[in-house]
Amino acid sequence: MAICSTDNELVELLWHNGGVVAQPQAAQARVVSSSGRGQSASVLTGDDTETAAWFPDTLDDALEKDLYTQLWRSVTGDAFPAAAAAGPSSHHAPPPDLPPPAARPPMRSGIGSSWTGDICSAFCGSNHIPETAAQRCRDAGAALPPERPRRSSTHDGAGTSSSGGSGSNFGASGLPSESASAHKRKGREDSDSRSEDAECEATEETKSSSRRYGSKRRTRAAEVHNLSERRRRDRINEKMRALQELIPHCNKTDKASILDEAIEYLKSLQMQVQIMWMTTGMAPMMFPGAHQFMPPMAVGMNSACMPAAQGLSHMSRLPYMNHSMPNHIPLNSSPAMNPMNVANQMQNIQLREASNPFLHPDGWQTVPPQVSGPYASGPQVAQQNQIPKASASTVLPNSGAEQPPTSDGI
């Protein structure tokens, strides 16, 4: 920005270190740039029409060079201290070569382009110089990525690319740490999944082993139960066969039928025993309630008609079973069961046996035994009375030899 002062001098306002600096100008401000072929070009500030009238035409080139050198040094002295140490062949101090950005590969055209940004608000220019071997090596060294990001990129598998001795690192500020954390997270997830798989396998193995153990235990218990049940059935079958042998004319095979036959056989045996006891005068030894099963015709029946009663004398008498039974009539409730009546019944039975012609076909009659005791029955007394009568009415044959001498014959 150019401002005219009161002394008809051109004053230029420059931005230097955060402040505005006013500097007088006596010559036309030009920016000279040198190329590799030695040509120079002047670049005006874009305000040529306004400033051309203030510069005289008689100024020589030496004055212009001196003014430009002073102006350039004052502007770039503080911003670029290394510009004063440039080569002596150039008539102005070139700006220092900045390293190219990390994302841009080096130029291959043989001509390096360097530009300076934010030098001043009024002057801007480009300086094209031929590229030398030292400069090319320096550019290649600056373009090479550092060693540490390359190791992290090889560990991560992405993020670096190199070609022809030069490379570029994309996102070198945050990718290594993020990739490392992602790798660690992935490793933790893998380890957790492996541990969970191992735990699942262990639980499945324990469950399968417990199932096998439980199944073995159940099968063993079932085998023991089957064996004990088989033994019990064998014992029952043996007992049933023995019972079947005791029952006459039993040809049943099933257990229920065999038990029914045994019950019926026991009932018939009990009835026969009770009848035999009644016919042989063993009424006091009768079972309670057995008289109701005895038929009336059995009372007073001849013992000779019942062959089974002949051997009852050899049997040992059983004790009296005094068990209470429902609807039982006591044995001594009737007067017929008294001892006197029992003795009379026995004598009557013996008298009928003695007078039975079928039992004594030869006419021989047995003399009934005399019953001794205070209880003398009526028929016994009558029989004793008949004996003297028979002896008195009987005529005995007389023989002389046998007759005793009488008193008449003396």
Curated annotation (Swiss-Prot):
Places the protein is found: Nucleus
Described function: Transcription factor that may act as negative regulator of phyB-dependent light signal transduction. Transcription activator that acts as a positive regulator of internode elongation. May function via regulation of cell wall-related genes. May play a role in a drought-associated growth-restriction mechanism in response to drought stress.
Stretches for region Disordered: 82-110, 137-225, 357-410
Compositionally biased residues, Basic residues: 209-219
More about this protein: Overexpression of PIL13 in transgenic plants promotes internode elongation. Expression of a chimeric repressor in transgenic plants results in short internode sections. Alteration of internode cell size causes the change in internode length.
Extent of Low complexity compositional bias: 82-92
Protein name, UniProt field: Transcription factor PHYTOCHROME INTERACTING FACTOR-LIKE 13
